[in-house]
Protein backbone atom coordinates (compact mmCIF):
# COMPACT_ATOMS: atom_id res chain seq x y z
CA UNK A 1 0.00 0.00 0.00
CA UNK A 2 1.33 3.42 -0.89
CA UNK A 3 2.10 5.86 1.90
CA UNK A 4 -0.64 8.27 0.81
CA UNK A 5 -3.20 5.45 0.99
CA UNK A 6 -1.93 4.52 4.46
CA UNK A 7 -2.15 8.17 5.44
CA UNK A 8 -5.77 8.44 4.25
CA UNK A 9 -6.74 5.19 5.99
CA UNK A 10 -5.15 6.26 9.26
CA UNK A 11 -6.80 9.69 9.12
CA UNK A 12 -10.18 7.98 8.55
CA UNK A 13 -9.57 5.66 11.50
CA UNK A 14 -8.72 8.64 13.71
CA UNK A 15 -11.95 10.36 12.71
CA UNK A 16 -13.86 7.20 13.67
CA UNK A 17 -12.02 7.03 17.02
CA UNK A 18 -12.72 10.71 17.64
CA UNK A 19 -16.43 10.18 16.97
CA UNK A 20 -16.49 7.14 19.28
CA UNK A 21 -14.68 9.03 22.05
CA UNK A 22 -17.08 11.98 21.71
CA UNK A 23 -20.04 9.60 21.94
CA UNK A 24 -18.57 8.07 25.12
CA UNK A 25 -18.18 11.50 26.70
CA UNK A 26 -21.68 12.66 25.72
CA UNK A 27 -23.20 9.45 27.08
CA UNK A 28 -21.60 10.11 30.46
CA UNK A 29 -18.84 7.53 30.36
CA UNK A 30 -15.43 8.47 31.73
CA UNK A 31 -12.74 9.45 29.25
CA UNK A 32 -9.19 10.69 29.49
CA UNK A 33 -10.03 13.03 26.63
CA UNK A 34 -11.99 16.25 26.99
CA UNK A 35 -14.58 17.23 24.41
CA UNK A 36 -12.80 20.54 23.74
CA UNK A 37 -9.61 18.62 22.88
CA UNK A 38 -11.51 16.49 20.39
CA UNK A 39 -13.60 19.29 18.88
CA UNK A 40 -11.02 22.05 19.09
CA UNK A 41 -7.80 20.30 18.12
CA UNK A 42 -7.91 16.68 16.95
CA UNK A 43 -10.99 16.68 14.71
CA UNK A 44 -10.25 19.96 12.85
CA UNK A 45 -6.61 19.03 12.30
CA UNK A 46 -7.39 15.54 11.02
CA UNK A 47 -10.21 16.79 8.79
CA UNK A 48 -7.89 19.40 7.29
CA UNK A 49 -5.18 16.79 6.60
CA UNK A 50 -7.76 14.41 5.14
CA UNK A 51 -9.23 17.03 2.81
CA UNK A 52 -5.79 17.57 1.26
CA UNK A 53 -4.91 13.86 1.24
CA UNK A 54 -8.08 13.01 -0.70
CA UNK A 55 -6.82 15.42 -3.38
CA UNK A 56 -3.51 13.54 -3.48
CA UNK A 57 -1.61 16.13 -1.45
CA UNK A 58 0.09 16.10 1.93
CA UNK A 59 -0.49 19.33 3.84
CA UNK A 60 2.33 20.68 5.98
CA UNK A 61 0.69 23.49 7.94
CA UNK A 62 3.94 24.73 9.46
CA UNK A 63 6.26 23.74 6.61
CA UNK A 64 8.12 20.52 5.90
CA UNK A 65 10.71 21.13 8.60
CA UNK A 66 8.23 21.47 11.46
CA UNK A 67 6.08 18.36 11.23
CA UNK A 68 4.80 17.84 14.76
CA UNK A 69 1.02 17.73 14.63
CA UNK A 70 -0.89 19.80 17.13
CA UNK A 71 -2.69 16.61 18.20
CA UNK A 72 0.66 14.94 18.95
CA UNK A 73 1.77 17.94 20.96
CA UNK A 74 -1.47 17.75 22.95
CA UNK A 75 -0.83 14.07 23.74
CA UNK A 76 2.81 14.50 24.74
CA UNK A 77 2.09 17.63 26.82
CA UNK A 78 -0.89 16.18 28.69
CA UNK A 79 -0.87 15.05 32.30
CA UNK A 80 -3.35 12.33 31.32
CA UNK A 81 -2.07 9.20 29.63
CA UNK A 82 -3.68 10.09 26.31
CA UNK A 83 -1.01 8.08 24.50
CA UNK A 84 -2.43 4.92 26.08
CA UNK A 85 -5.91 5.41 24.61
CA UNK A 86 -6.88 3.91 21.23
CA UNK A 87 -7.20 7.42 19.79
CA UNK A 88 -3.86 8.50 21.24
CA UNK A 89 -2.07 5.47 19.80
CA UNK A 90 -3.54 6.15 16.36
CA UNK A 91 -2.49 9.81 16.49
CA UNK A 92 1.05 8.77 17.40
CA UNK A 93 1.03 6.25 14.52
CA UNK A 94 -0.11 9.08 12.26
CA UNK A 95 2.76 11.24 13.48
CA UNK A 96 5.28 8.51 12.59
CA UNK A 97 3.82 8.16 9.11
CA UNK A 98 3.56 11.95 8.67
CA UNK A 99 7.26 12.28 9.52
CA UNK A 100 8.12 9.83 6.74
CA UNK A 101 6.16 11.61 4.00
Language-model-derived ranges and their functions:
Residues 1-37, 98:
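Short terminal alpha-helical segments
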Residues 11, 18, 39, 43-46, ...:
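Generic L/I/V-rich hydrophobic alpha-helical segments across diverse proteins
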Residues 15, 34, 40-41, 81, ...:
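Amphipathic alpha-helical interaction segments
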Residues 19, 23-26, 30, 56, ...:
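Residue-level signal for well-ordered alpha-helical segments
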Residues 24, 40, 48, 60, ...:
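Intrinsically disordered, low-complexity segments enriched in glycine/proline and serine/threonine
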Residues 30-44, 62-67:
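Short, charged, amphipathic alpha-helical segments
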Residues 44-61, 82-86:
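Amphipathic alpha-helical coiled-coil segments
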Residues 64-101:
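Amphipathic alpha-helical binding modules
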Amino acid sequence: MRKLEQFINLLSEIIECTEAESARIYSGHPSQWEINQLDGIVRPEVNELLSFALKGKVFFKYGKRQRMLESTYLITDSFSALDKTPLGRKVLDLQKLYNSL
